[in-house]
């Protein structure tokens, strides 16, 4: 993780000095690749340092960190750019990244064993692990790829991401074209879901750890159905009903925020082998963003394919979009139910 953050910080500094578009694009891509080292490293650390009954609380707060980081970036970097110019935006981000790499290197330790502590999630009579258990990482990672429960969770998360990015990408347009909201009002309503999403993600682990004894399946079902209900309120009630749409976005944001934590990684980490939790997150993450990408294509095709011109005005029929978005949320719940009793291998 230190390596990824350090290289990303150095690339940001280089971007500030770049004058070539091709070099800028190459550095941007390399930066993204090194940034991808962060999530898996964090999840591995969480799985090694915290027990099953407390991991969810920390995982939930960690899951919200990228949203908080983005918000701070928009504020801090935008302020730097407005005063000093765009190059200094990269310089500022690079310096913060270097500081972060130093902090991670100093305080982020590989495992309890590396600091002389006994491993967590190991029976009391077995506080030491055999060499084969601690070194056969490749076998454990291959096992993740063949675990049906991980694959089903990946599908569930992919369908959840379809409904998530449907609202994020098309929600403002939908409110304008279908319900007649102004751009400002539509943007405000959709922004409610983003704020509530952060709250839902931050407290998702606390909910499962404190209220359900570390079980994720029950709250995943509750908030999955909450997501379905929110989309039905948002899509199936015609006309301008500001407070109803606002309530729908509150429910949607809270539901998606919790599901991002559970379906988007935590449930897979819980059932994956301890030394392959990063691989489990990777499988779910890839499937999730494939779903998000397909959503943009499918939604665009369905919206454009059911557009008509009446008296020189573009009119959209969102019937099929409604089915697609709500259906995806329902399928996400359906697949999550398939792994109701899944246990760690």
Where are these regions (language model features)?
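Structural signature of the two symmetry-related core transmembrane helices
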Residues: 1-13, 218-233
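Helix-breaking motifs and short loop linkers at transmembrane-helix boundaries and internal kinks
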Residues: 11, 17-22, 180, 237-239
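Cytoplasmic helix-loop-helix junction between adjacent transmembrane helices
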Residues: 27-68
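Helix-loop-helix hairpin linking two adjacent transmembrane segments in secondary transporters
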Residues: 62-113
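A membrane-interface helix-boundary motif in multi-pass transporters
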Residues: 82-94, 215-218, 301-329
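Juxtamembrane intracellular "pre-TM" segments in multi-pass secondary transporters
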Residues: 115-152, 178
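Extracytoplasmic gate region of multi-pass secondary transporters
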Residues: 147-204, 260, 295-299
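Helix-to-loop junctions at the C-terminal end of transmembrane segments
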Residues: 202-214, 303
């Amino acid at each position: 993780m230190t390596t990824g953050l350090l290289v990303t910080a150095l690339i940001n500094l280089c971007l500030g000095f770049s004058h070539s578009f091709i070099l800028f694009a190459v550095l941007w891509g390399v930066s993204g690749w090194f940034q991808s080292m962060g999530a898996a490293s964090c999840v591995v650390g969480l799985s090694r340092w915290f027990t099953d009954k407390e991991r969810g609380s920390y995982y939930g707060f960690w899951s919200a960190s990228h949203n908080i980081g983005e918000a701070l970036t928009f504020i801090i970097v935008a302020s730097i750019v407005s005063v000093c110019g765009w190059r200094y935006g990269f310089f500022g981000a690079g310096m913060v990244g270097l500081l972060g790499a130093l902090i991670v290197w100093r305080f982020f330790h590989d495992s309890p064993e590396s600091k002389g502590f006994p491993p967590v999630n190991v029976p009391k009579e077995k506080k030491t692990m055999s060499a084969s258990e601690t070194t056969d990482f490749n076998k454990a990672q291959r096992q993740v790829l063949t675990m049906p429960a991980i694959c089903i969770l990946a599908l569930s998360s992919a369908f959840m991401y379809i409904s998530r990015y449907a609202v994020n990408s098309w929600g403002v347009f939908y409110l304008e074209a279908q319900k007649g909201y102004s751009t400002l009002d539509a943007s405000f309503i959709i922004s409610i879901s983003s704020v509530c999403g952060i709250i839902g993600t931050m407290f998702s682990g606390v909910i499962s750890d404190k209220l359900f004894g570390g079980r994720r399946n029950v709250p995943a079902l509750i908030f999955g159905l909450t997501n379905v209900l929110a989309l039905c309120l948002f899509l199936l009630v015609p006309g301008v009903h500001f407070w109803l749409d606002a309530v729908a976005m509150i429910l949607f944001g809270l539901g998606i925020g919790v599901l991002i934590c559970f379906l988007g990684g935590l449930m897979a980490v819980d059932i994956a082998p301890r030394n392959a939790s990063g691989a489990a997150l990777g499988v779910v993450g890839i499937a999730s963003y494939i779903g998000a990408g397909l959503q943009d294509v499918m939604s665009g095709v369905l919206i454009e394919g059911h557009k008509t011109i009446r008296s020189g005005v573009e009119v959209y029929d969102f019937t099929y979009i409604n089915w697609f978005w709500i259906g995806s949320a329902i399928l996400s719940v359906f697949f999550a139910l398939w792994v109701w009793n899944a246990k760690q291998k």
